[in-house]
């Protein structure tokens, strides 16, 4: 593909928006035939697509909002982007994500364009909303500022008190709802590909919002999966079929969500100091039914046992090696909210059960040192602690 300059991005973005407006005028031209798509059954959808609410910011607006991209307002930095806190003319706190000047290759620009094209058309309380973009003097995305930072920053900051159980449960349920929306509630199926605690942001009420759509993929209704190379994502969250074969579909996100649930329950990081993944540590405990051994010891027993059982059962289904035997996110929500823990329903055939523990965790560990992940892994969108935000805002 030819190298895309900023002017080309502007033109392509304009075409994307025009195309969406045309779809709004003719709802029957949608890419997905909702009447024939099983994925959309029992999912409330508006009869017509919602028009994007983002706007194009001028460079002057975001320059002034961030005080000239002052280092005092820098709240996150990754392999190819930086995030600045800002204050709009209307007094709204915003986050400005900037493609760094050193990241001038085609792939980084493509990631930005992907994020605009994906998140610009989603509307759900558990998915971060795009306020707008700017394509003058660089590439910028503008979001509402998430004052509490990411789940990872709150869960793993040793200087903060442990997150209480009810907040953890609220985060788990809200994130599941947001992911279910991406898979089944959008006009086009969206596979996020990088679900993890540092990509789930929290508002003042601890309502979670899924963020960072740079790796996201549209999945047309007639397709069963994408085949992707090179493999990008985060070590410890990658589903076996993606890690080994590049196969991506909704179940890829389901696996990562299972790891996210285990992280919420245990307070452990997805990969520990010995390079053991969280899901490989948890599987034997789940298999033996010793659920309470999963719980973050910092909670000192202060948790709701029925809720714990539901989250743990959901996690055990999500992290299955065989994607066929993983639930959809709708089914995950049934477990988490309705207590649907019918073990007979989810019992795998004996031969599948034996293959479940054939050694993917060992393979993952062997490949870990040479496995190449996206440079975005170093720091995710606004992955910053409350302390650093409050210090810089004072």
Name each region found by the language model.
Residues 72-83:
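Protein kinase glycine-rich loop
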